[in-house]
């Protein structure tokens, strides 16, 4: 005789959390200038980023690196080479660049050569930063271009180059205002890791950064956002989540675990975040179910494995949602707020499901 054992939703959520990829601690974020947009299209169309290094040749850089493995000594050697490039004026004996400028140039070359690594995220602005492109660095070492590439990309030889896979570009007006602060830095290359959460929520609906899980709700309403609708959406969603937690008997999770960061632009983003990753995953799945499902971007999945576990959770939430009349009323209220704010469906649902399934197949 077969006995149907109760489903342990806590174990299912724990398994999902274990397999959701965390943004690596070593990942860095770089703003790379394009000479007032001059090289924006060249970088985009040819899948690379570059830094002018006319003050020192790549051959000399490679020679210095082979000689000086210590970063401090390597940087000092670069500074000496850059200083030699700016020869003193014959009449005054002064260099055409002061020590501060020489140090700045050397530091930029050093950063690009040694610190921009595979897996890092790069951001490039067009003219007046009207467009901004985001990409992932594909190699740590300086790119070696073929003769054909050098013929096609007429500026390639004047740069230190690294290959990039471009993810997406955005009109500046559609970006989170907090990203604008990056563009106050005018150096050729600037590390912008302090904006990591803002950058990631521009690109993803769900991510884990520095042990904190983020669920992004995209509000797409074009004109002014009604305060009652905005706060009603948040309150009602957390009430639904609290009921789901109770109905599925989820342990050590509460709607009180969440903090919120709101970009109140129209359109804008609501960032629900918590260090209780299990709760954020449950909120993600709940939003997907109450938001209308998870058809997205043509992703296909295996029928077994972790997607099956995710399916069990979402089916349970669906069953909860449909069980009683007052829950139907609760969903109607949520839908009313969601529709007023034109909240985007959760695009990353199938991507996350595919991600955790792929992770399950990797050797531990």
Regions found by a protein language model. Name each.
Residues 329-363:
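Extended, charge-rich intrinsically disordered regulatory tails
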């Amino acid at each position: 005789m077969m006995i149907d054992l109760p489903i342990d939703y806590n174990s299912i959520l724990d398994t999902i959390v274990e397999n959701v990829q965390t943004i690596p601690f070593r990942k860095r974020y770089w703003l790379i200038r394009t000479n007032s947009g001059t090289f924006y299209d060249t970088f985009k169309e040819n899948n690379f980023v570059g830094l002018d290094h006319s003050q020192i040749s790549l051959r000399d850089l490679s020679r210095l690196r082979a000689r000086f493995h210590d970063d401090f000594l390597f940087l000092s050697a670069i500074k000496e080479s850059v200083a030699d490039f700016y020869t003193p004026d014959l009449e005054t004996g002064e260099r055409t660049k002061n020590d501060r400028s020489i140090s700045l140039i050397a530091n930029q070359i050093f950063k690009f050569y040694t610190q921009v690594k595979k897996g890092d995220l790069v951001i490039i602005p067009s003219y007046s930063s009207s467009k901004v492109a985001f990409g992932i660095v594909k190699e740590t070492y300086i790119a070696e271009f073929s003769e054909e590439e050098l013929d096609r990309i007429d500026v390639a030889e004047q740069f230190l180059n690294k290959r990039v896979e471009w993810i997406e570009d955005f009109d500046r007006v559609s970006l989170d205002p907090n990203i604008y602060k990056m563009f106050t830095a005018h150096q050729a290359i600037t590390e912008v890791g302090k904006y990591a959460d803002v950058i990631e929520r521009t690109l993803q609906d769900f991510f884990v950064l520095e042990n904190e899980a983020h669920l992004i709700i995209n509000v797409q309403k074009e004109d002014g956002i009604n305060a009652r609708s905005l706060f009603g959406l948040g309150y009602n969603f957390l009430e639904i989540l609290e009921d789901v937690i109770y109905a599925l008997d989820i342990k050590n999770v509460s709607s009180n675990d969440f903090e919120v960061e709101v970009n109140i632009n129209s359109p804008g983003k609501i960032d629900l975040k918590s260090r209780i990753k299990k709760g954020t995953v449950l909120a993600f799945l709940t939003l997907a179910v109450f938001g209308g499902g998870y058809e997205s971007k043509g992703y296909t999945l295996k029928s077994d494995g972790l997607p099956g576990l995710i399916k069990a959770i979402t089916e349970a939430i669906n069953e909860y949602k449909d069980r009683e009349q007052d829950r139907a009323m609760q969903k109607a209220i949520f839908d009313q707020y969601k529709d007023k704010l034109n909240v985007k469906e959760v695009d990353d649902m199938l991507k996350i499901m595919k991600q955790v399934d792929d992770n399950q197949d990797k050797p531990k």
